[in-house]
Amino acid sequence: MSYYGAGMLRARWASWRDWRQQRRGQANARWGWIKPPAGRGPAIWMQGFADFDDLRLAADLAKAIREKRLDLRVVLTFEAEHPDLLEQMDGVPGLGYGFGPCDHPQAVARALERLTPLRYLALGAPPRRHLAAALTQRAIPAVLLGTGPGLGPLPPVEAVYPRNTEQAEAWRSLLPAARIEDPVDFSTLITVAQVEPNFRALACGGDDWQLWWVAGVSAASAGRWIQAWQGSPLRRSGLLFLSGQGVAPAGLERMSRWARTPLAPGSALWVDEGRWHPALAVAAQGVHLEAASTGDIWQAFAGGRPLSAAPLSRLSRPEAMGPELVPILTAPGAVLARWQGLLGDPMAAREQGDAARRAFWAERRRAGERLPAFLERVFAW
């Protein structure tokens, strides 16, 4: 990921590289040269940083804000580009998007001068140190969603919408209780909840293989998963799907190159396209969350399959991820042994999957009930 901190030399170096690679818009925006949409209405600055799931939510909220307040101009900035996501925002009146500034005081000041925002909204992380200080200096209220507090100074917080109880507790010593909303995860509203269950037929043909999915695999851990898989009896009648960030590990076929023909039992594939995740969540007999994003976590819950997980940060994991519903497992062999046990106890597997699905829908209902109040806050600005 490109540099967006406060260091002058590193930020200049990052911008020079962007210029060399014809990314002039990113280079200019890093130093605050951001242009709001045309118009005279007040501007709202939404900062989505680099996380794909936070940006998905930011894009949907930006469109909802525009529908609620037609006079507002909404500026959504990010630090990593996702072209498929950005296409969804093309043509929305009063909505602009692009790369954001780094945290050097000069870049922050220039961005705020050009945007003169009525409010600042951050999703997934709090504003960095110099931006938080500048918001305070200019008395620009901030609304923070899905994040705990950072290590630097606080901006003038109007409200926080924590994702879970742990985030809410982290705010209690810093803010009056009236500014801390009850925990809610709005990302459940953009989770794909209804999926046609045809992926199994595509992968297995006329055979009845079991499908297993591990989400959030790193390149370093992929080898351990393959080694454990090759020694597991599940391999005789199963297919293993590993998804994660970065380049596919050596020897693993990528889903983007899969010819959509039935797979042989024992096959292992690297899922390098996120569009397959909803189908995998529904088709798999079991899902393990190694270092998964919030989006993948809720997608797995929505799929209604037995879940397990590696230890995840308490500040970022969903409220529903208690050990009674999602056992904590670290070694690939332990996960495969759990899956083997689920094959021998289909009733328990069904009950665990149903409980996961109920947890997803309960959180989605809460988010749906809370969203109108958030939009009413926007309407009152």
Role assignments for model-derived ranges:
Residues 1-40:
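Positively charged, low-complexity intrinsically disordered leader regions
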Residues 26-39, 151, 194-203, 220-225, ...:
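A short, well-structured juxtamembrane/interface segment
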Residues 29-32, 41-190, 217-221, 232, ...:
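Active-site and donor-binding regions of nucleotide-sugar-utilizing enzymes
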Residues 53-68, 191-262:
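Conserved catalytic-core segment of nucleotide-activated headgroup transferases in glycan assembly
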Residues 89-99, 249-272:
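Nucleotide-activated donor-binding/catalytic signature segment of Leloir-type glycosyltransferases, i.e.
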Residues 115-119, 265-293:
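Acidic donor-binding loop of glycosyltransferase active sites
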Residues 157, 278-359:
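Catalytic binding pocket for nucleotide-activated donors in carbohydrate/polymer assembly enzymes
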Residues 363-381:
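C-terminal alpha-helical cap of glycosyltransferases
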